[in-house]
A protein has these predicted regions:
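Bacterial N-terminal signal peptides
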Residues: 8-17
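A local structural motif
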Residues: 85-96, 190-204, 239-242, 320-323
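Ligand-binding "clamshell"
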Residues: 125-137, 232-246
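Short helices/loops that flank or line small-molecule/ion binding pockets
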Residues: 101-115, 128, 162-163, 207-227
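Bacterial N-terminal signal peptides that target proteins for export
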Residues: 1-8
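Bilobed "Venus flytrap"/periplasmic-binding protein-like clamshell domains
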Residues: 62-85, 119-120, 124, 143-212, ...
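N-terminal hydrophobic or amphipathic helices and topogenic motifs
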Residues: 21-102, 286-323
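Periplasmic-binding protein-like
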Residues: 65, 140-152, 237-275, 279, ...
Length: 323
């Protein structure tokens, strides 16, 4: 009897194990973290099929990528978030974040539901935190994106990129596309210049820190996003002639907006509706972002729009593993 009982238990365990292996095989995920699946091949974490894994919070938390003073953007987003409250029937709270890493961790841990992640952080947010981006800001004629520029100050003695050799170049943070990853790849491929060998790299933390650092002559040169530079000049934080551009890249997609992967589908649909039906005219959002010629939310797919960014990451040996 004991032998039969043991055998039955063994066979049951074997079947469960086999079932688990099949389930594992039926959950393709590419570079996504092991907690996510990507059965439709869009490179994004799928919505959970188990209702118990879906969330429908009473209060939605929104965070915008950590550039410049968070207080500025709390005000800038206020009219939009009021509209989102109307559309979703939920309270919506602006959550100021101080770093890309903190923003990603907040979404991974379930404390952040809607976000705008900067260009370089999007792939890590997608793969590690289950971020599902679906829109970016664009101009009214449908153009979108920004360029990475390397800037210096007048009279610095730096007139070309090669003049940075033997000197210092300020980056923003390791997760930033225009503030680190793109310039690193471009410097290596176009100029045979590598940080630590040909110049000293320092990190300022944010684009506005780098821009102010150059304008105040604390940094001889910096790699920055020109969309941030344009807004700072428009707000007269610096004057246009405080800095000089010595390099301008191809156009990259700008901040990607989206939701956590596990919100209930009806809520996610209403959040998307809020983005695509928001009337910009006369709002706090328009007042801030018209400075960089943005005036609408444009539908996009991460798989297509972030292809160039993933290629830059691959060239830099970037891993999307959660740390």
């Amino acid at each position: 009897m004991k032998t039969k009982t043991f055998l039955a238990a063994f066979l049951a365990a074997l079947m469960l194990s086999a079932g688990g292996a099949v389930a594992q095989e039926e959950c393709p995920r590419g570079t996504l973290d092991e907690r996510y699946c990507d059965r439709d091949g869009d490179l994004l974490a799928d919505t959970p099929t188990d209702p118990a894994e879906l969330v429908d919070p009473d209060t939605l938390i929104f965070a915008y990528t950590p550039v410049e003073d968070p207080a500025v953007y709390k005000e800038a987003w206020s009219d939009f978030l009021d509209y989102m409250e109307e559309v979703t029937g939920k309270d919506v709270v602006f959550f100021p974040v101080q770093s890309n890493a903190a923003q990603i961790e907040a979404m991974r841990s379930g404390r952040l539901h809607i976000a705008g992640f900067n260009t370089g952080s999007n792939p890590l947010a997608v793969n590690c935190a289950g971020f599902n981006p679906f829109t970016i800001m664009a101009s009214l004629d449908g153009n979108f994106g920004y360029e990475m520029e390397i800037i210096t100050y007048p009279g610095s003695g730096i007139e070309t990129v090669e003049d940075i050799r033997g000197g210092v170049l300020a980056f923003t943070s390791p997760t930033s596309n225009s503030g680190f990853k793109a310039p690193s790849a471009i410097l290596a491929s176009e100029f045979d210049m590598v940080a630590g060998r040909d110049f000293e790299a320092v990190f300022s933390g944010k684009h506005d820190n780098s821009i102010l650092g150059v304008a105040n002559k604390d940094y001889p040169a910096a790699a920055i996003a020109n969309s941030v530079l344009s807004r700072m000049i428009s707000r007269e934080v610096i004057q246009a002639d405080d800095v000089v551009s010595i390099y301008k890249s191809q156009t990259f997609p700008t901040t990607g907006f989206g939701t956590a992967y596990n919100l209930v589908p009806e809520l996610r649909a209403n959040i998307e509706k809020a983005f695509f039906t928001f009337e910009w005219e006369g709002t706090s959002l328009q007042r801030e972002f018209e400075k960089s010629n943005e005036g609408q939310f444009l539908e996009m797919t991460y798989k297509e729009f972030w292809d160039v960014i993933r290629k830059i990451d691959a060239a830099n040996g970037v891993s999307y593993a959660c740390e």
